[in-house]
Amino acid sequence: MNKNRFYVGLLVTAILAVLVYASYGMVNAGKKETYHSVAVIVDDSSSDRWTAFKEGLEQGADEENFHINVVSTSSFVNLHEECSIISRELENGADGVIVQLCGDDADGLFSGIVSGVPTVLAENEGESESLFTTVMADPYEIGRTIGENLLAGAGDSLSGFTVGILSGNQKMKSQRLRLEGFQKAVERSGAEILWTLSDEEVGDQSALERYWKEKPVSVLVALDNDETELAGDFILGLSGEKPKLYGEGCSEKTVYYLDKGVIASLVVPNEFFMGYQCVKELAEKINYHQDNGVTEDTVDFLSATRENLYDRDTENILFPNIS
């Protein structure tokens, strides 16, 4: 009798377990994990200067259940071209966008396209009084730090030094601020700035060579990753005395040039954190419907030299996936 009761109890327990499991399945039937699609539009997205940035995006996306689509782009001709890509991504169903604006939104084209769309800007805040959350390293401080690194390398006096500046895309407010910060840092140093060239004036190495032949300089200053790579390529091809190079960047090539002594000092923004924080800011707008208005999240940066390239702090920014 006791044995029969035992088996009956066991059977009832098994039936209850099946019923609970089935009920759970019915309640959750049709429920799907919600993913939001985010389009990321940056200049020349295949460049490895975006490697750490993309890793930060993916880290944030994993935490927020976002699907990140880094749109395949080449170098933008102008803001209108970039805006056409943004418009297409929104038409294709993007729930939000992370954008590196390639110029100022003077005519309101960009603002109009993303009106009502959760939007975060990366690296460049765009118009003079941006309407959007921006995540970037302080551009003025980056420029000033490059200038201070140059002064430190020259013993705090640049008397007798001639300088050529590759200023990058001057349609971007962030690049203009970098130039302003550098100029302020060296204005009383005794340095003679012989030329300042934007990316429109120096599109490739042959163009730089033409300027160099007319006015060679003892120091090259490059204010963004692409210009630093260009200057490094140029210096490698020079015979005889080579100029010192001070720049900004985070790509594999710039790190290689720093390690080989082609670059004297490199300012490196924390692009992993920039990507991560862009997603976190966008999540506030998409998941929690919170709009904190016009805010600016400042990303840290550091100065790397050949001597501190493999220090832990430097590696944490340059190689976040292996640190």
Describe these PLM feature segments:
Residues 7-24:
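Hydrophobic membrane-insertion alpha-helices, especially the h-region
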Residues 24-53, 132-133, 162-171:
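Short beta-strand segments enriched in small/hydrophobic residues
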Residues 38-55, 60, 69-80, 102, ...:
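Extracytoplasmic "Venus flytrap"
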Residues 69-91, 194-214, 228-230:
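Structural motif
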Residues 97-115, 182, 199-255:
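Hydrophobic alpha-helical
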Residues 105-141, 251-259:
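Flexible loop/hinge segments that line or gate small-molecule binding clefts
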Residues 134-161, 250-254, 269-287:
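Hydrophobic alpha-helical segments within soluble ligand-binding/sensing domains
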Residues 273, 277-323:
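Hinge/cleft segment of the Venus flytrap/periplasmic-binding protein
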